[in-house]
């Protein structure tokens, strides 16, 4: 048991001898506990050096070893859900010496990635996709005539999503030969653990029991009343002893729960289950943060870890004041607004901490709904509340709102219901990479009729635009980025800002910068250097068409800036407006290129997209030069 993160690389002689699962499978079972200890120590050390997802990986060390020990990976397919727990998997699959690069530019991804390794069979970052993908692989293997085995590893939190149950239902219906490993770390499903349960699990996973079970089906199946009696007897016996009745009813052969940290039991169960045909589910109980006491005591707080920086001391040094994160700006606004309006209800799909809702949940528990990983349900739940005169606020990451797009259109916007969406992690998210990037929300929201979409430029404007959106009698969204802003002073008073109206922050000549969002401080540097005008647009929908027309009439070039894909983004909205009015003026649109942006620091990602001060200035000066050359060519 560790109480501190090791700062020196631990001795891991057995782990160092393993470069692939093939070498792991050459070990004796007696060596596996030592390997688990070394793997856990190495994981603690590397995440301390780099930062990254932490608790989930510590909890599946033994499970990961057992899976690669029993299954012939990569020929057999292991499909991981979400991916937070795959650091041990990466270490065992030829990437141990690259773990220092995880979540860094040009380094390993923090999630499974097909381009990175043949052992990463399915790219992931969002939850509840593993069972569907694994079923597809199993069907594909069968169609190809191979004997390949497929296993999906899914957590109890991810199992709450509807997609997981859709896949379970279909896999059972098609009798797909696959294994689902339910990694239960007590975040959702209550475990049924004990000596009798472990004993029954071993029996239910044994070849004898399953051959007897299948043989009985064949024999008694010819005598319908007898088979029905036997089936009901087994159902009642197992339902009394275990939580697996639901999965058995769906058509899965359920085994468990078993201790997910007992390598002997894991290996024995997996070996037996690998030989059993049809859909199977193994329920394992694990502890998130296993082996690191602070993480065991606080699994939520240690879900992810920042890089451990060396301590520095300076005489007379004064710590710089900490900037407020946008998620905390939202959290404080939510509490303040709830104190004013008892109709406010806060909803989040399993993102209470990340969305800044802990304070609200504590102060207003009767008005707080964490619906688990169920984005579709969250949005339609809010729609139903709005039908009854309540004022729901849905706090959700940009990337996860994509999963509820039909509900957004059909259940909220089509009925013009009064639902406020606080869209966190809009724009680039840094080390979490493309699976979590909020690159598309402007594009997919602004095309929805009756939707209001606001893009605050700083912390105070975020607070005021949240209040503005809340007052709007229809669907309204406020998007804001991960992390902190410029450090603006936040006014406690809440003021509804004029809808669809921007603000001129600097009057200049020739070039007008139209900024949508928190690139404003960077744009201000460029505007100052180029003598350009600068507008804080505030709203993508409705656009401040009057301000755009005024800038077009008094400048030679308009430049739009946004942290969103250029395709269909705010720049496209400006272009559409200019075209509709017959306003002929050069327009330079700056935003994200038509690509998925790989993991790196947010600063580096912005620079790579040309959205730092240097990149913006260069793009503008080059465009002006191109315009001058074109004018000269026409004149000549």
Swiss-Prot record:
Mg(2+) binds at residues 156, 185. Its EC number is 2.2.1.7. Gene3D superfamilies: 3.40.50.920, 3.40.50.970. Keywords: Isoprene biosynthesis, Magnesium, Metal-binding, Thiamine biosynthesis, Thiamine pyrophosphate, Transferase. NCBIfam families: dxs, PRK05444.2-2. Belongs to the transketolase family. DXPS subfamily. This is 1-deoxy-D-xylulose-5-phosphate synthase. It comes from Cellvibrio japonicus (strain Ueda107).
């Amino acid at each position: 048991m560790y109480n501190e993160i090791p700062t020196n690389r631990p001795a891991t002689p057995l782990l160092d001898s393993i470069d692939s699962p093939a070498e792991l499978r050459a070990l004796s079972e007696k060596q596996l506990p030592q390997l688990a200890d070394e793997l856990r120590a190495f994981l603690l050390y590397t995440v301390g050096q780099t930062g990254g997802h932490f608790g989930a990986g510590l909890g599946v060390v033994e499970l990961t070893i057992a899976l690669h020990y029993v299954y012939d990976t990569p020929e057999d397919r292991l499909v991981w859900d979400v991916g937070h727990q795959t650091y041990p998997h990466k270490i065992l699959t030829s990437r141990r010496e690259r773990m220092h690069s995880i979540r860094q530019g040009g380094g390993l991804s923090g999630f499974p990635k097909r381009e990175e390794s043949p052992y990463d069979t399915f790219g992931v970052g969002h939850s509840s996709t593993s069972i569907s993908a694994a079923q597809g692989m199993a069907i594909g293997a069968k169609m190809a005539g191979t004997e390949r085995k497929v296993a999906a590893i899914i957590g109890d939190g991810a199992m709450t999503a509807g997609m997981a149950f859709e896949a379970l239902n279909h896999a059972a219906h098609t009798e797909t030969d696959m294994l689902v490993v339910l990694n239960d770390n007590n975040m959702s499903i209550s475990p049924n653990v004990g000596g009798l349960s472990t004993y029954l699990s071993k029996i239910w996973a044994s070849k004898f029991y399953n051959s007897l079970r299948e043989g009985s089906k064949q024999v008694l199946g010819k005598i319908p009343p007898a088979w029905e009696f036997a089936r009901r007897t087994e159902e009642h016996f197992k339902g009394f002893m275990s939580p697996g009745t639901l999965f058995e009813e769906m058509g899965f052969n359920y085994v468990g729960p078993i201790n997910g940290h007992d390598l002997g039991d894991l290996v024995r169960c997996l070996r037996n289950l690998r030989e059993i045909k049809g859909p199977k589910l193994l329920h394992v109980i694990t502890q998130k943060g296993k082996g690191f006491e602070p993480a065991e005591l606080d699994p939520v707080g240690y879900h992810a870890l920042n890089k451990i920086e060396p301590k520095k001391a300076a005489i007379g040094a004064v710590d710089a004041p900490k900037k407020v994160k946008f998620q905390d700006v939202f959290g404080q606004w939510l509490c303040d607004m709830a104190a004013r309006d008892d109709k406010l209800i806060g909803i989040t799909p399993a993102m209470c901490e990340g969305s800044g809702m802990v304070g609200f949940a504590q102060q207003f528990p009767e008005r707080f709904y964490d619906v688990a990983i169920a984005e579709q349900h969250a949005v339609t739940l809010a729609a139903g509340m709005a039908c009854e005169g309540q004022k729901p606020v849905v706090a959700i990451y940009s990337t996860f709102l994509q999963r509820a797009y039909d509900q957004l259109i059909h259940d909220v916007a089509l009925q013009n219901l009064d639902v406020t969406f606080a869209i966190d992690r809009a724009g680039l998210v840094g080390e979490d990479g493309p699976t979590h990037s909020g690159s598309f929300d402007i594009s997919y929201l602004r095309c929805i009729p009756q939707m209001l979409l606001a893009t605050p430029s700083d912390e105070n404007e975020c607070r005021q635009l949240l209040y503005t959106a809340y007052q709007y009698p229809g669907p309204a969204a406020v998007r804001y980025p991960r992390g902190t802003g410029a450090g603006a002073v936040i006014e406690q008073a809440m003021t509804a800002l004029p809808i669809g109206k921007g603000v001129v922050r600097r009057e200049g000549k020739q070039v007008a910068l139209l900024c949508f969002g928190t690139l404003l401080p960077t744009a201000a540097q460029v505007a100052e250097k180029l003598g350009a005008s600068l507008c804080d647009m505030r709203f993508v929908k409705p656009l401040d068409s009057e301000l755009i027309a005024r800038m077009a009439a008094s400048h030679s070039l308009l430049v739009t800036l946004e942290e969103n894909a250029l395709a269909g983004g705010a720049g496209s909205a400006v272009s559409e407006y200019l075209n509709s009015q017959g306003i002929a003026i050069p327009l330079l649109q700056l935003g994200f290129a038509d690509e998925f942006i790989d993991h790196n620091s947010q600063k580096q990602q912005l620079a790579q997209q040309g959205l730092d001060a240097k990149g913006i200035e260069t793009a503008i000066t080059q465009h002006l030069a191109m315009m001058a050359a074109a004018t000269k060519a026409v004149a000549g």
